[in-house]
């Protein structure tokens, strides 16, 4: 039996690296597209890499870019994938306000380029296509919780670009018979999450503060409510969506909601820190109420370690996101296995280990840059 061949865009990111691991364990030959830069930026997949001169190499990287249609067509022609997972994107909401045109080129037109390459190469009957969509499509939410039929109301250039990608995926499915589907992903995290995303900013920042590398964590909207899951659970669902008889779009979520404030509190407790939130709005702060154990030697009772900086507010806020994963459970039998508490514990432990290493370097006179935007 021939191995299935998968092509992943965004393979060096959080989801791409977990998906690559998952598919390799299932016996796939996995190809990934990465952008060329002066740095390799492959740390999330380095453990999967093998010398291409060896026999039976099942993991291969290709230089490519979602803004280059000829490049994408060449890679697809060479790889002839059974499954394409489009996880590559400019995925930071705040950055999309600063670089809206680039975000549209990558996230919207990049998806079109992949679908058109599949059509142009005559792969419409061979290749299945998964599009990583986003809960940001719901934006100014029209109903709670959000499900597959909830109307979209995007509130950022990122979300608008992703809405085009969502509909062009459906259009190519209906127009050309491509097995193409959207996974509407709610927030999903892990120790591999980018350091500028809110959850990783929190766990990394709290660990750094605990070790004396930072004084205070500056945040935006503490009242924002999100549905957070673990990326490992979500990439399994992405794979399951391409194993069905017919393509269908699904919400991928936990169905449970927490505030940014609660995520901060949970992260602090993993370090033995009890916080008290005082003040309101831009004047809200988190004060250390007690410290237990040895994980936070640099912190004392009364320290202010979290504050609000209005610079981190979005031009158009998304106040609440809560997904309804009941269709995925009913049709595919998918349920998330990792709880938020387990995920927070894993993320804090990983960031604490790094912070302790940086603190040791600093103690011995080395310069350590731990700034978080």
Swiss-Prot record:
GO terms for molecular function: GDP-mannose 4,6-dehydratase activity; NADP+ binding. It catalyses: GDP-alpha-D-mannose = GDP-4-dehydro-alpha-D-rhamnose + H2O. Keywords: Lyase, NADP. The active site is at 134, 136 (nucleophile), 158 (nucleophile). Its cofactor is NADP(+). Gene3D superfamilies: NAD(P)-binding Rossmann-like Domain, UDP-galactose 4-epimerase, domain 1. This is GDP-mannose 4,6-dehydratase.
């Amino acid at each position: 039996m021939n191995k299935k061949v998968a092509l992943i865009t965004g393979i060096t990111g959080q989801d791409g690296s977990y998906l690559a691991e998952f598919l390799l364990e299932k016996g796939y030959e996995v190809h990934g597209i990465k952008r060329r830069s002066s740095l390799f930026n492959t740390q999330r997949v380095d453990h999967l890499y093998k010398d291409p001169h060896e026999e039976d190499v099942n993991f291969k990287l290709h230089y490519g870019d979602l803004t280059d249609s000829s490049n994408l067509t060449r890679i697809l022609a060479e790889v002839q994938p059974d499954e394409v997972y489009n996880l590559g994107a400019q995925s930071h909401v705040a950055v999309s306000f600063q670089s809206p045109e680039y975000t549209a080129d990558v996230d919207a037109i990049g998806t079109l380029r992949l679908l058109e390459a599949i059509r142009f190469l005559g792969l419409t009957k061979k290749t299945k296509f998964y599009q990583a969509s986003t809960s940001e499509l719901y934006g100014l939410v029209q109903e709670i919780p959000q499900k597959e039929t909830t109307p979209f109301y995007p509130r950022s250039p990122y979300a608008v670009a992703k809405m085009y990608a969502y509909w062009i995926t459906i259009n190519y499915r209906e127009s050309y018979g491509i097995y193409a589907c959207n996974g509407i992903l709610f927030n999903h995290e892990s120790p591999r999450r980018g350091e500028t995303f809110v959850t990783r900013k929190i766990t990394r920042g709290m660990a750094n503060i605990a070790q004396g590398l930072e004084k205070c964590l500056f945040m935006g909207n503490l009242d924002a409510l999100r549905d957070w899951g673990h990326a490992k659970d979500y990439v399994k669902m992405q794979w399951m969506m391409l194993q069905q008889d017919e393509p269908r779009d699904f919400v991928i979520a936990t169905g449970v909601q927490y505030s940014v404030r609660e995520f901060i509190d949970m992260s602090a407790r993993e370090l033995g820190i009890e916080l008290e939130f005082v003040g309101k709005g831009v004047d809200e702060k988190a004060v250390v109420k007690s410290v237990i154990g040895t994980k936070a030697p640099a912190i004392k009772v009364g320290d202010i370690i979290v504050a609000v900086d209005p610079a981190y507010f979005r031009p158009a806020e998304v106040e609440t996101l809560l997904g309804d994963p009941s269709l995925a459970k009913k049709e595919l039998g998918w349920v998330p296995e990792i709880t938020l508490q387990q995920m927070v514990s894993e993320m804090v432990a990983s960031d604490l280990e790094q912070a302790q290493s940086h603190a040791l370097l600093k103690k011995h006179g080395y310069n350590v840059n731990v700034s978080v935007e």
